[in-house]
From Swiss-Prot:
Annotated organism of origin: Aedes aegypti (Yellowfever mosquito)
Covalent S-S links between cysteines: C62-C89, C75-C95, C79-C97
Designated name of the protein: Defensin-C
Designated gene of the protein: DEFC
Keyword check for Nucleotide-binding: no
Tissue: Hemolymph.
Annotated phenotype, changing P34S: In isoform C1
Family to which the UniProt record says this protein belongs: Belongs to the invertebrate defensin family. Type 1 subfamily.
């Protein structure tokens, strides 16, 4: 039974290594623009830099990591990295940093 498991695992690894997949998207036509980047494409260079610096996902720390049980700890670490005195996840799953 153990030998069969090892053989299946090796076969799975080899198939994953040698399978040729294309992770890159195909060529887009000139008239088709991706909507996700349309805000950043239309901004001048100074505004683009400011938009990138101020882009925040406030719920990412508490929402995404709450499934692993480290939501509040990750929020506190995030706030300490921002030179605050810690933080917590509120009822809406938004990280709130203490001053």
């Amino acid at each position: 039974m153990r030998t069969l498991t090892v053989v299946c695992f090796v076969a799975l690894c080899l198939s994953a290594i040698f399978t040729t997949g294309n992770a890159l998207p195909g060529e887009l036509a000139d008239d088709v623009r991706p909507y996700a980047n349309s805000l950043f494409d239309e901004l001048p260079e100074e505004s683009y830099q400011a938009a990138v610096e101020n882009f925040r996902l406030k719920r990412a720390t508490c929402d995404l990591l709450s499934g692993f049980g480290v939501g509040d700890s990750a929020c506190a670490a995030h706030c300490i990295a921002r030179r605050n005195r810690g933080g917590y996840c509120n009822a809406k799953k938004v990280c709130v940093c203490r001053n």
